């Protein structure tokens, strides 16, 4: 699963991965996890938005927002975030990506994700930072006996 929705200053992205590390013996969790990147209002400062990473370690069929999860702040006081996804098939950047819909990119991951964040510098001016993350796996992982 890889779902990314754009259209505002702060897009949301949610994907499943086998990258969770189980740290305690007999923990009721596995290496499978769902990661989300989204914004949250800073509870200590008004009108401040933080970019956070959410990890849901125990998967279920409930809505993701209703399940317990760990939140880690990635960037404090972010002004904007832009996510773009490189489609090797179309040779173009896409604003959204959804592997769960038949009219989306079913069974296909982007080869790269371009992440651009806007923050305020020490002079209170917008400052943009951009990087790209390469996704090495493009094919779905199917467990067919």
Placement of each model-derived feature along the sequence:
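Short coil-to-beta-strand transition motifs
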Residues: 31-32, 69-77
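Short linear sequence signals and composition-biased patches located at protein termini or domain-edge surfaces
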Residues: 75-145
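A general secondary-structure boundary signal
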Residues: 34-36, 69, 130-134
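A short, structured loop/turn motif at beta-sheet edges
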Residues: 8, 39-47, 73-80, 107-109
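Short helix/strand-bridging catalytic loops that position acidic/His residues to coordinate divalent metals
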Residues: 62-70, 98-101
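Extracytoplasmic beta-strand-rich oligomerization domains located immediately C-terminal to a leader/signal peptide
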Residues: 1-63
């Amino acid at each position: 699963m890889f779902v990314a929705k754009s259209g505002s200053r702060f897009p949301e992205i949610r994907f499943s991965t086998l990258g969770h590390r189980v740290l305690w013996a007999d923990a009721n969790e596995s290496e499978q996890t769902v990661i989300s990147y989204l914004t949250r209002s800073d509870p200590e400062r008004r009108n401040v938005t933080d970019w956070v990473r959410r990890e849901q370690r125990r998967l279920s069929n409930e809505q993701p927002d209703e399940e317990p999860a760990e939140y880690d702040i990635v960037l404090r006081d972010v002004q904007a975030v832009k996510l773009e996804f490189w489609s090797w098939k179309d040779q173009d950047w896409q604003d959204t990506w959804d592997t769960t819909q038949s009219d989306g990119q079913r069974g296909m991951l982007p080869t790269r994700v371009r992440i651009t964040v806007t923050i305020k510098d020490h002079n209170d001016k917008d400052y943009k930072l951009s990087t790209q993350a390469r996704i090495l796996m493009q094919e779905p992982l199917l467990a067919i006996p």
